[in-house]
Amino acid sequence: MSTLKMMLLILLLLLPMATFDSDGQAIPGGGIPSAVNSRVRGDEKSGRSLEKRCRSGKTCPRVGPDECCERSDCFCKMVPARPYWRNKCICL
């Protein structure tokens, strides 16, 4: 009986109740964009690139917003970051 109770508890915890409105209608996906994403999207719409926003003009592409390097003589290197690897600016 305890195994059955545990399975029911797990199923209830996994049920995506947060995706429903109070009247039972599903809330559309996408959510509210973060301030960073809004800023990046706004710059993309205006034709302003990340290189123009960075003082150094050097960026390292990564998941999410790209990282601006401090200087133009920096290079990108893959570094471990949980749960995956990401590019990081390395300046000598």
Curated annotation (Swiss-Prot):
Instruction: Name residues in a coiled coil.
Output: none
Q: Which UniProt keywords apply?
A: Cleavage on pair of basic residues, Disulfide bond, Secreted, Signal, Toxin
MF annotations from Gene Ontology: toxin activity
Annotated Gene Ontology cellular components are: extracellular region
Q: Which residues form the propeptide?
A: 21-53
Keyword Hydrolase appears in the UniProt entry: no
Q: Is Glycoprotein found in the keyword set?
A: no
The entry's free-text remark on domains says: The cysteine framework is XV (C-C-CC-C-C-C-C).
Q: What is this protein called?
A: Conotoxin Mr15.3
Q: Which organism is it from?
A: Conus marmoreus (Marble cone)
Q: What is the lineage of its organism?
A: Eukaryota, Metazoa, Spiralia, Lophotrochozoa, Mollusca
